């Protein structure tokens, strides 16, 4: 039979109750956080998030919170670490599909659906933010969106961002895809698409799956040809952005446009 703590006031006696033990690898449920003992310090990710905010958590821990609990034989934190390592970055995770997630033995359809839903929310939020922005005068205004869309692709993608006369976003679309070493880009097709969108200005971008962002001689030649072709139809090429894994290169910032 349990007895009260006779040497302590009732409130302190109640506060001295230990939190129930949690199995290893399981994120603590919210209802377990309602009563905390005096001197308690947050250790688990959810506890630290509630105490200090999401910035206090690592990427692995944020992913672990999304997963919730581990599958039998698969620790949730180990699964989160493997995901971040496998996809190399959070941008890589945002590009992953449900099949990519379910290829990991620690993730089933339910957890895969949860991850895909969160990444799609992030993608839509960035798109909304880009549409709500003030006129765009630099590549930095759409850089995050471009990195999210094409930065983690294992193949090269050439994309165009169409802007109106006030440099507000009209649309963004992929023009072409290619191999790791070769991609065919036709300036006349980009000019045609700019006219279809009734664009007054354009930002083009392509990714380097290798991670290096230094433009090649062919990148510079293509940019000059595209600049001149767009000028013939009164469309201004504002920038050409090269996107790596964690860095970008702007032709405009380098003074090449």
Curated annotation (Swiss-Prot):
Transmembrane segments: none annotated. It comes from the Bacteria. The keyword Hydrolase applies. Zn(2+) binds at residues 206, 208, 219. Residues 1-28 are annotated as: Disordered. Residues 135-257 form the MPN domain. GO terms for biological process: proteolysis. A motif (JAMM motif) lies at residues 206-219. InterPro entries: MPN (IPR037518), RadC_JAB (IPR025657), RuvA_2-like (IPR010994), UPF0758 (IPR001405), UPF0758_CS (IPR020891), UPF0758_N (IPR046778). PROSITE patterns: MPN, UPF0758. Pfam families: RadC (PF04002), UPF0758_N (PF20582). GO terms for molecular function: metal ion binding; metallopeptidase activity. Keywords: Hydrolase, Metal-binding, Metalloprotease, Protease, Zinc. SUPFAM superfamilies: RuvA domain 2-like. Belongs to the UPF0758 family. This is UPF0758 protein Bcep18194_A5833. It comes from Burkholderia lata (strain ATCC 17760 / DSM 23089 / LMG 22485 / NCIMB 9086 / R18194 / 383). The lineage of its organism: Bacteria, Pseudomonadati, Pseudomonadota, Betaproteobacteria, Burkholderiales.
């Amino acid at each position: 039979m349990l007895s009260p703590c006779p040497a302590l006031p009732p409130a302190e006696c109640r506060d001295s109750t230990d939190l129930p033990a949690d199995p290893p690898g399981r994120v603590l449920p919210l209802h377990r956080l309602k009563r905390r003992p005096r001197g308690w310090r947050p250790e688990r990710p959810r506890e630290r998030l509630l105490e200090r905010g999401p910035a206090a958590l690592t990427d692995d821990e944020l992913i672990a919170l999304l997963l919730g609990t581990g599958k039998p034989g698969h620790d949730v934190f180990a699964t989160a670490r493997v995901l971040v390592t496998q996809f190399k970055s959070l941008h890589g995770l945002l590009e992953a599909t449900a099949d990519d997630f379910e290829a990991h033995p620690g993730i089933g359809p339910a957890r895969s659906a949860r991850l895909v839903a969160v990444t799609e929310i992030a993608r839509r939020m960035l798109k909304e933010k880009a549409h709500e922005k003030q006129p765009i005068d630099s590549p930095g205004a759409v850089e995050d969106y471009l990195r999210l869309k094409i930065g983690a692709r294992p193949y090269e993608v050439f994309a165009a961002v169409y802007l109106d006369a006030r440099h507000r976003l009209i649309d963004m679309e992929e023009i072409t895809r290619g191999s790791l070493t070769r991609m065919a880009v036709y300036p006349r097709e980009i000019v045609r698409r700019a006219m279809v969108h009734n664009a007054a200005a354009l930002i083009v971008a392509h990714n380097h799956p290798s991670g290096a962002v230094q433009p090649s001689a062919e990148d510079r030649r293509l940019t000059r040809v595209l600049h001149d072709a767009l000028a013939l139809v009164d469309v201004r090429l504002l920038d050409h952005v090269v996107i790596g894994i964690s860095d970008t290169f702007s032709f405009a910032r380098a003074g090449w446009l």
